[in-house]
């Protein structure tokens, strides 16, 4: 069998030489896709040792078709005759020649395909021609292929690969240009014709390998290429889904919105009724989605058109009520525009119209403040809710409230406050009741909770004590019925003077500082010489008026009329107080009418005494100083001590401290009562129980607390209390209260009582010196006190005191 095989190979060996030479033009650079050119030198002829190698030949074709090899062996063994051997030999020779011719044509194509797709070794076209192959010819072809590829072809090792794997392993090739060229050959018709011309017939090879390869539909490759192109377009459609779609946004926003307060978001359907914008998607799924959205919006449109009618019944908060004046107009404009705008209109036109409407609501700062003043607001907690029947219900309610208030004011009797504000003080700025709606008149209410009718009394016009205030149901006399100021008598009153507020404060302060008792005989004697007929200030010159105004302690005024009115008023007050001679009797009335009369009397007396002392005290200051040291001054000076509590460093006055002391009459009597008690019962006061001095005007305390402190805490002056002489501590208290006030306007030297009231630190040495020289002499006390005794008295009364720094190391 080896002999027969050797003969066949030797006879066919010369035919392999031309096949190597014919492969040269087929493996040029153009068809090898930029591969290195094939060497032009012919390869050497194979040696005899290479040709006669049966194991190599059988090992090389071991991966071939085993079925054909076995059938060929069976046919050779079955042949027994020489004739059959000759026929078989001739048939194999012809098949070998035909196979060599086919291989010479298909060899370049198979080699190029091996470079691209890495397939198995070339397979002949016909079935019968695969049995006879020479080992020498196979070696020569392998050497020629290695020279052409220059070690780039790594798959000519007899390894068989599947056709499906060849498609998936294209991206793993090192030469990307070859892969892209192979993919492009499936699309271009020129490459297809070239492949058919070269004779690459893969269908036959696939059929031959059905024995060991599973059945696979090869037609899916073309479909896969088409699907790849479709996937590219579908991937772009998937990306388009991530774009902004107005229709989808509107549908999502519509499902989240609901009816609420004006400050919440509204439905977009009420504003935007246009058709959704066209999308760039072309797939049927996108078209169906868009049609579904359009149908959904069209179905919701009829239901949404009837919903704005429920706005009048919705629940609003305080913020919504306040902002309703601005939001209602804008929303009404949008509702009216919604019915007129067609669905094809652009959104920009609506936004432009809405912006114009909002801009029209903005006002300048001045107009905004004026509009805010006229705005009606209802205040309440944020949790308080109210249902409104119409947008104008709030304004109608405010109008009804105002109408009811006006009707109540017209029906009720006019109060004296209104009359005083309209007729009595309409042309003056001096009066404290310049306007009827001050704080106290607004806040004053009776037991039923209604506004109380406050009576305003003109203390300047009340010239006689017999003139009582009118009854509540009566009316004040008309000011127009009074005579002119030129023809009025001395007993009649004058109209109030128009003076600025600064002058009013100066009048009150100066008259309080310069006021003295009307029962002083020394002042009466000095002032009696000054009585004369009322001068005509209208005939005076401006310079004389200024001098006279300065005498009364007022600043110069620019208006001549104001100066004349001030001078006439001051002169009238002096002479009226001198003629009437009203005494100030403290006490509390039993009934309401008596209380009003007593209040009017006290106010009248104070006003008269203040205006009377304005001129007399300045002209008779010399006689006042002389009488201050005499016994007559002891009867007159209690009024100064009573008024001393109202003396302050500033020009404004404050509440009278003596009024606070009156509530403790049983514990701490007023200075006037102490003086009168001491004068009337001097013998009884020496033997009486000493008064408690634990409470002072600066820190008033209740009688219960005073008695408790005096009972539980032993007094440091217990030894002095046992004697028949009055307690020295009580004498110091009386002396402090009886010290005359300083008459300086600026109060640079306040009295000791004033220093105690203002919590000024008391220097013990100075205070003791004053008591020994002047203070104790006011109460007819001949004893002297030391600084240490004064310190004990100050500490017992809670007065801030201390020694001088140079005289004592410690200061309290």
From Swiss-Prot:
Modification after translation is described as: Phosphorylated in response to DNA damage.
Q: Report which superkingdom the organism of origin falls in.
A: Eukaryota
Q: Compositional bias of type Low complexity: which residue ranges?
A: 36-49, 690-706
Q: Which CDD domains match?
A: SAP_SLX4
Cite the record's Basic and acidic residues compositional bias ranges.
Answer: 169-179, 282-292, 476-487, 612-640
Q: Which GO terms describe its molecular function?
A: 5'-flap endonuclease activity
Q: According to the UniProt entry, which residue ranges have a biased composition of type Polar residues? A: 644-653
Record region (Disordered)? 36-194, 212-231, 249-312, 465-494, 575-719
Stored InterPro entries: Slx4_ascomycetes, Structure-sp_endonuc_su_Slx4
Sequence ranges of Acidic residues compositional bias: 656-667
**Alphabetical list of HAMAP family matching this protein:** Endonuc_su_Slx4 (MF_03110)
What protein family does this chain belong to?
Belongs to the SLX4 family.
Name it: Structure-specific endonuclease subunit slx4
Q: Which organism is it from?
A: Neosartorya fischeri (strain ATCC 1020 / DSM 3700 / CBS 544.65 / FGSC A1164 / JCM 1740 / NRRL 181 / WB 181) (Aspergillus fischerianus)
Q: Which gene underlies this protein?
A: slx4
């Amino acid at each position: 069998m080896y002999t027969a095989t050797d003969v066949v190979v030797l006879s066919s060996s010369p035919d392999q030489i031309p096949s190597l030479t014919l492969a040269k033009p087929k493996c040029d650079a153009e068809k090898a896709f930029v591969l290195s050119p094939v060497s032009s030198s012919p390869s050497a002829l194979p040696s005899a040792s290479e040709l006669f190698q049966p194991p190599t030949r059988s090992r090389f074709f071991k991966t071939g078709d085993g079925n054909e090899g076995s059938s060929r062996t069976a046919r050779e063994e079955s042949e027994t005759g020489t004739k059959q051997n000759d026929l078989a030999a001739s048939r194999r020779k012809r098949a070998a020649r035909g196979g060599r011719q086919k291989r010479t044509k298909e060899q370049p194509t198979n080699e190029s395909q091996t470079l691209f797709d890495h397939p198995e070794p070339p397979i002949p076209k016909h079935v019968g021609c695969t049995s006879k192959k020479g080992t020498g010819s196979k070696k020569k072809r392998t050497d020629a292929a290695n020279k052409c590829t220059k070690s780039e072809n790594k798959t000519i090792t007899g390894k068989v690969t599947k056709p499906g794997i060849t498609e998936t392993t294209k991206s793993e090739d090192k030469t990307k240009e070859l892969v892209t060229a192979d993919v492009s050959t499936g699309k271009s018709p020129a490459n297809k014709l070239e492949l058919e011309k070269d004779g690459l017939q893969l269908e036959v090879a696939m059929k031959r390998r059905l024995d060991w390869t599973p059945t696979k539909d090869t037609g899916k490759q073309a479909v896969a290429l088409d699907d790849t192109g479709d996937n590219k377009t579908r991937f772009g459609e998937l990306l388009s889904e991530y774009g902004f779609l107005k229709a989808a946004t509107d549908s999502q926003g519509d499902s989240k919105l609901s009816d609420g307060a004006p400050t919440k978001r509204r439905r977009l359907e009420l504003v935007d009724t246009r058709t959704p914008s066209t999308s760039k998607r072309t797939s049927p799924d996108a078209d169906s989605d868009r049609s579904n959205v359009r149908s959904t919006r069209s179905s919701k449109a009829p239901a949404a058109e009837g919903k704005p009618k429920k706005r009048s019944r919705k629940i609003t908060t305080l913020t919504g009520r306040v902002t309703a004046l601005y939001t209602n107009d804008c929303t009404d404009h949008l509702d009216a525009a919604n019915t007129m705008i067609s669905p094809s209109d652009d959104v920009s036109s609506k936004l432009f119209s809405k912006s114009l409407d909002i801009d029209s609501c903005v006002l300048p700062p001045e107009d905004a403040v004026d509009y805010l003043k006229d705005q009606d607001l209802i205040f309440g907690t944020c949790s308080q809710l109210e249902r409104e029947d119409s947008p104008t219900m709030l304004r109608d309610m405010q109008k009804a409230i105002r109408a009811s208030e006006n009707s109540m004011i017209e029906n009720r009797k006019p109060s004296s406050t209104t009359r005083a504000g309209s007729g009595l003080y309409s042309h003056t700025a001096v009066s404290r009741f310049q306007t009827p709606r001050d704080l106290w008149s607004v806040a004053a209410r009776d037991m039923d909770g209604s506004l109380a009718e406050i009576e305003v009394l003109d203390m300047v016009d009340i010239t006689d004590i017999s003139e009582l205030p009118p009854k509540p149901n009566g009316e004040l006399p008309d000011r127009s019925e009074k005579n002119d100021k030129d023809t009025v008598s001395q007993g009649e009153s004058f109209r109030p003077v128009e003076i600025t507020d600064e002058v009013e404060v100066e009048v009150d302060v100066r008259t309080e500082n310069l006021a003295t008792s009307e029962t002083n005989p020394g002042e009466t004697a000095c002032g009696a010489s000054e009585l004369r007929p009322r001068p005509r200030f209208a005939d005076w010159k401006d310079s004389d008026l200024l001098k006279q105004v300065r005498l009364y302690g007022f600043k110069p005024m620019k208006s001549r009329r104001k100066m004349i009115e001030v001078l006439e008023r001051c002169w009238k007050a002096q002479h009226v107080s001198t003629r009437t001679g009203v005494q100030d009797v403290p006490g509390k009335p039993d009934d309401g009418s008596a209380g009003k009369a007593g209040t009017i009397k006290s106010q009248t007396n104070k006003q008269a005494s203040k205006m009377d002392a304005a001129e007399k005290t300045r002209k008779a200051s010399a006689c006042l100083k002389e009488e201050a040291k005499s016994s007559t001054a002891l009867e007159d000076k209690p009024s100064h001590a009573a008024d001393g509590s109202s003396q302050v460093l500033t020009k404004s006055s404050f509440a009278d401290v003596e009024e606070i002391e009156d509530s403790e009459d049983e514990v701490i009597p007023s200075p006037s009562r102490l003086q009168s008690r001491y004068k009337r019962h001097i013998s009884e006061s020496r033997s009486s129980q000493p008064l408690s001095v634990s409470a002072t005007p600066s820190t008033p305390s209740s009688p219960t607390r005073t008695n408790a402190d005096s009972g539980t805490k032993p007094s440091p002056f217990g030894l002095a209390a046992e004697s028949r002489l009055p307690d020295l501590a009580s004498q110091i208290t009386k002396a402090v209260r009886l010290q005359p006030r300083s008459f300086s306007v600026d109060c640079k030297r306040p009295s000791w009582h004033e220093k105690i009231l203002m919590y000024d630190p008391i220097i013990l040495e100075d205070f003791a010196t004053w008591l020994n020289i002047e203070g104790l002499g006011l109460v007819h006390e001949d004893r002297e006190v030391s600084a240490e005794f004064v310190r004990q008295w100050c500490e017992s009364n809670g007065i801030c005191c201390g020694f001088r720094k140079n005289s004592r190391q410690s200061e309290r």
